[in-house]
Design a protein with these regions (language model features):
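Gly/Thr-rich phosphate-binding beta-strand-loop-beta motif of the actin/hexokinase/Hsp70
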Residues: 10-35, 123
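Nucleic-acid-processing active sites and adjacent nucleic-acid-binding tracks
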Residues: 35-71
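Short glycine-rich phosphate-binding loop at a beta-alpha junction
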Residues: 69-79
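Short alpha-helix plus adjacent loop in nuclease-associated cores
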Residues: 97-140, 194-195, 299-308
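Glycine-rich, often acidic, oxyanion-interacting loops/wings at catalytic, nucleic-acid
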Residues: 151-252
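Phosphate-backbone recognition surface of nucleic-acid-processing proteins
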Residues: 249-255, 261, 265-349
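Low-complexity, acidic/Ser/Thr- and charged residue-rich accessory regions of DNA metabolism proteins
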Residues: 298, 338-383
Length: 383
């Protein structure tokens, strides 16, 4: 008698869990999908209601007739809900993974149905496949510890404030340029005095409401700059304390010429502080600096870098790569760039600097993990 596909699937698929649980998260309601490997069950609960989660898990056990101490595995997509749910599930004895949503396979049709039930079913089926042995099915997020996640707030707040400062400065310039006026430094201490002396094209003072709006915008700008100054001082205070391993890594990075206060902090808190890279390929791939080939049949082309990961770290690494060429001209990496790319045009140099950034991150990782100084690099003298 021939075996059906379903029978073969059950026979040759290793069952690593008794109950699978997938979360489809949204603002007001969460969709929960359960399966014992054969049947499925879907329920809606109020968002962030932990009591309902425990209740539905118990009902799922009864539905699937699971008794005793069973193994439960779960998953949800990484997003704005962060990692608190992951930590809660682990505390409850549920083995949870957080999945990169961009790595989930979807239909390539021009139009495809999308509902919470369909998404929950898809997550649930992929979770069973993942624990059935398909480990490369999707990308699992490396969840930071609570302290590591907390330490990232300082540099991310500085990043947000810096964007806000640029917006305030541009808004002030835009309001004045509408009257044919231009100021060099909208955040200067004497800006208000300069504002009083400004005159329009016909010699008149600025309209009262416009002047009042510019003044309020200036006050908001000054407040943002004061907060940025406070955060920078707090950052230096923490580095001097060297209270954690991450802070000691920040101080270690600063011993290299070309690595400044901001870049050393961002690299450690976002990348080197708590992520466990196993090899140089993972280091280069994290900020999205690795190539993306397209080689199918007779079609072969390069699609550029993958641009995965945080754009801030990718942009910062390229910025620091240019600085490395300037402040470490005798290093092996700088000499390699000069030999391969310096003689070409601007386009060739831009391609080359991406390779420098990728290689530099690998060298910085080796320096922090194994104490190997980048070849030819100069260290700052101890003060």
């Amino acid at each position: 008698m021939k075996k059906t596909k379903e029978t073969l699937k059950r026979q040759y698929t290793k069952k690593e869990a008794d109950l699978h649980l997938a979360f489809e998260l949204s603002q007001k309601t969460w969709r929960l999908g359960f399966s014992d490997g054969n049947k499925m069950r879907f329920k809606n609960i109020d968002a962030r209601n932990l009591e309902q989660i425990q209740e539905e898990v118990g009902l799922a056990k009864e539905r699937f007739k699971l008794k005793g101490d069973i193994k439960i595995v779960s998953c949800y997509e990484a997003g704005r809900d962060g990692f608190w749910l992951h930590r809660y599930l682990l505390k409850c004895g549920i083995e949870n993974i957080v999945v990169d949503s961009s790595s989930i396979e979807v239909s390539r049709r021009k139009k495809r149905a999308k509902t919470d039930r369909i998404d929950a079913r898809k997550l649930l089926m992929m979770l069973m496949r993942y624990h059935g042995g398909e480990r490369r099915l999707w990308s699992v997020v490396n969840v930071p510890g609570e302290n590591d996640e907390n330490e990232r707030n300082l540099n991310r707040e500085l990043e947000a404030l810096n964007r806000g400062r640029t917006s305030h400065r541009n808004r002030i310039r835009g309001l004045l340029i509408q009257q044919g006026l231009e100021v060099k430094n909208p955040s200067g201490k004497r800006f208000l005095e300069e504002l009083e002396s400004l005159r329009t094209w016909d010699g008149k003072e600025l309209p009262e409401d416009l002047k009042a709006r510019v003044i309020r915008e200036y006050e908001r700008l000054r407040m943002v700059e004061e907060q940025m100054s406070f955060l920078r001082k707090e950052r230096e205070k923490r580095v001097k304390s060297a209270a954690t391993s991450s802070l000691r890594k920040v101080a270690q990075l600063r011993t290299l010429n070309g690595i400044g206060k901001t870049s050393s902090w961002d690299f450690v808190m976002e990348m080197f502080g708590w992520r466990n890279f196993r090899n140089r390929k993972q280091v280069g791939a994290f900020p999205g600096l690795t190539p993306t080939p397209y080689d199918s049949g007779g079609s072969r082309r390069e699609q550029g870098i993958s641009k995965s990961g945080r754009g801030r770290i990718r942009a910062l690494s390229i910025q620091i790569a240019w600085g490395w060429l300037r402040f470490q001209p005798k290093s092996k990496l700088s000499l390699w760039f000069a030999e391969r790319f310096a003689g070409g045009g601007s386009r060739i140099r831009r391609i080359g600097i991406v390779a420098v950034a990728r290689k530099l991150l690998i060298d910085l990782w080796r320096y922090l993990e194994y104490g190997v100084v980048p070849e030819g690099a100069q260290l700052r003298p101890e003060i």
